[in-house]
């Protein structure tokens, strides 16, 4: 059983300089994610295998994420997405080619996930998986992605559109068999950060606590620098929810540190706490 201890001033907005300690569990061998509500002192665990991909439901966003969280058991696999560099859903993806184009969530924004990679920098109409048409106010999908599931098998996936707040996407086995088309409406997930989907069940999954959350304790891939190289490495860390502001105060006394000293450092980037600010017991 892996347990994290947080001793933090994250409740400043509720009770200035009130310090509390909360114990958070991510299950045996990191096999769970934990969604924490700091104000209520609660944590809700969900199995890593509960969901596979997730869609942003914020009005102006079109982010699509993969579930990188995986337990530490030998041979356990996360969900992995690959860019096939093809727009032909009928074509059979070739692993020898697409395995050179793995995609990862960047943990720098809840507006852009793994399937938003390869968008044109500086072009606000390019969302990677599709392009926004100002005339029709629709995002039309382009590319096909290869998705490796936790059992090692593959699906091909194409997000076809985002129209009037409704995502339409299709997926199938590489040979085209078992093709399924699904829709996810943002309005069905009002008040949530993401709409979560499981390929195993073919349905959306209720993941986030009903009372909201501030932090997620999970495993994810982070770009780490080793010597002169940069490597995507599976880490255990803490991500802040969309809109939650975080400031890092290093080498301070928790009993005397002042909120006012860090107001200008507050940021909504999800990985401010990240993978290097934890204590394991």
Predicted segment positions?
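Surface-exposed, beta-sheet-biased, low-hydrophobicity segments with strongly acidic/polar composition
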Residues: 19-281
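Bacterial Sec-dependent N-terminal signal peptides
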Residues: 1-22
């Amino acid at each position: 059983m892996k347990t994290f201890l947080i001793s933090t001033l994250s409740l400043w907005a509720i009770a200035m300089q009130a310090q509390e300690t909360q114990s958070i569990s991510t299950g045996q061998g990191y096999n769970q994610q934990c969604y924490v509500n700091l104000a209520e002192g609660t944590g809700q665990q969900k199995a890593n295998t509960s969901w596979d991909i997730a869609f942003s439901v914020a009005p102006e966003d079109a982010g699509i994420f993969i579930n990188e969280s995986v337990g530490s058991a030998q041979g356990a696999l996360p969900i992995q997405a690959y860019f096939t560099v093809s727009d032909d859903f009928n074509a059979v993806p070739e692993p020898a080619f697409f395995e050179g184009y793995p995609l990862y969530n960047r943990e720098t924004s809840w507006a852009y996930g793994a399937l938003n990679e390869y968008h044109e920098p500086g072009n606000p109409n390019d969302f990677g998986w599709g392009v926004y048409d100002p005339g029709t106010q629709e995002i039309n999908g382009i590319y096909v992605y290869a998705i490796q599931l936790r059992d090692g098998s593959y699906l091909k996936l194409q997000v076809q559109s985002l129209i009037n707040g409704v995502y339409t996407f299709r997926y199938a086995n590489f040979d085209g068999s078992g093709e399924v088309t699904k829709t996810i409406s943002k309005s069905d997930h009002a008040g949530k950060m993401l709409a979560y989907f499981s390929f195993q069940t073919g349905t959306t999954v209720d993941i986030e606590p009903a009372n909201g959350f501030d932090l997620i304790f999970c495993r994810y891939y982070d770009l780490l620098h080793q010597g002169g190289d940069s490597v995507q490495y599976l880490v255990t860390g803490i991500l802040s929810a969309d809109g939650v502001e975080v400031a890092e105060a290093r080498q301070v006394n928790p009993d005397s540190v002042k909120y006012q000293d860090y107001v200008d450092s507050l940021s909504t980037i999800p990985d401010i706490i990240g993978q290097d600010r934890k204590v394991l017991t």
